[in-house]
From Swiss-Prot:
PROSITE patterns membership: ERV_ALR (PS51324)
Official protein name in the record: FAD-linked sulfhydryl oxidase
Domain ERV/ALR sulfhydryl oxidase: 1-97
Subunit structure: Interacts with A151R.
Source species: African swine fever virus (strain Badajoz 1971 Vero-adapted) (Ba71V)
Keyword Oxidoreductase: yes
GO cellular component: host cell cytoplasm; virion component
Catalysed reactions, semicolon-separated: 2 R'C(R)SH + O2 = R'C(R)S-S(R)CR' + H2O2
Function comment: FAD-dependent sulfhydryl oxidase that catalyzes the formation of disulfide bonds in viral proteins produced in the cell cytoplasm. Involved in virion maturation.
Keyword Cytoplasm found: no
Keywords linked to the UniProt accession: Disulfide bond, FAD, Flavoprotein, Host cytoplasm, Late protein, Oxidoreductase, Virion, Virulence
Pfam short name (any one): Evr1_Alr
Amino acid sequence: MLHWGPKYWRSLHLYAIFFSDAPSWKEKYEAIQWILNFIESLPCTRCQHHAFSYLTKNPLTLNNSEDFQYWTFAFHNNVNNRLNKKIISWSEYKNIYEQSILKTIEYGKTDFIGAWSSL
């Protein structure tokens, strides 16, 4: 069985983390396009439907990286809730990704997938 979810989540969260803290209109537009392409690329049509539905009900917040990260965090928890997987707090999310970013920078590798692989 192909476990594509953790890799998709990792790319989504990383995009939000490295998003600008003062994005231009062009950067916001590119982020919207990236999210739409991200959703369309999901290998599960039911997942695509749920993601588009979530996006419609919870529009992207692209004022800065923190807002965008919070949107991805809430989206991930929404999916986990629907799948009866663990829901994490905002502080847990920040710890997982901030620590993983530091490991990536320091050691040239990451443990993002290990951190949330069971979620």
